[in-house]
Amino acid sequence: MRSNHNQFLISLIKECNMKIAVIGATGTVGKAVVQQLAARHDIIEVGNSSGRYQVDITDIHSVERLFEQIGKVDAIVSTAGKLHFGPLQELTPEKFQVGLRDKLMGQINLALVAQHHLNDGGSITLTSGILSHEPILQGVNATTVNAALDGFVRAAAIELERGIRINIVSPTVLQESLASYGPFFYGFEAAPASRVALAYSRSVEGAQSGQVYRVW
């Protein structure tokens, strides 16, 4: 009986094998997500300037070309996006546009295009961050962008069709990034990228939509 049960589980897992595009696969979180999902699914690794598949998420035409190349997928994961850090008194519209153009609109570009290239029941997982709820000095751009992304996901979830889901992962500062960003995050508990990657697994391999998965 146990043997038959195990065979059933193996068969079920094989049937759940998905084709997943990971945008930002060469970054710290992206690599951890690929490592977390690759044992169970077929992963398409997408970088910004390296690898077989590349995309400039700030350019909607580049995003469209990417999906023309990779075809239909079951899920997309975005761990990409740049932000600007600096004192409020020195912020200019040009500096503020860094986060708006890249992390915010770049990921929204991905979602808007991906909805038409996902198989029925597919999923979209984006990335925001703890600063949406816990602002820090010199982090106005990051707080604005992350909060907007959380809002976009909650709103988009009620309009997506064909059973497509959308969620977002909101991580704290990474342990791997403390050397560069640690002084901005005194008092924050850092998390390893491997732990953050579990939240992406929950989104991709789960059933919920409109969720903000906080890793903090």
Regions found by a protein language model. Give the residues of each.
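N-terminal Rossmann NAD(P)H-binding glycine-rich loop of SDR-like oxidoreductase domains
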Residues: 22-36
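Rossmann-fold cofactor-recognition segment
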Residues: 47-61
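Conserved Rossmann-fold cofactor-binding substructure of NAD(P)-dependent oxidoreductases
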Residues: 57-73
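Conserved mid-core alpha-helix of short-chain dehydrogenase/reductase
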Residues: 62, 105-113
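Conserved NAD(P)H cofactor-binding loop of Rossmann-fold oxidoreductase domains
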Residues: 77-86
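Substrate-binding pocket helix/loop in short-chain dehydrogenase/reductase
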Residues: 87-88, 95-97
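Catalytic loop of short-chain dehydrogenase/reductase
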Residues: 99, 106-109, 123-149, 153-158, ...
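C-terminal helical subdomain
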Residues: 161-164, 168-216
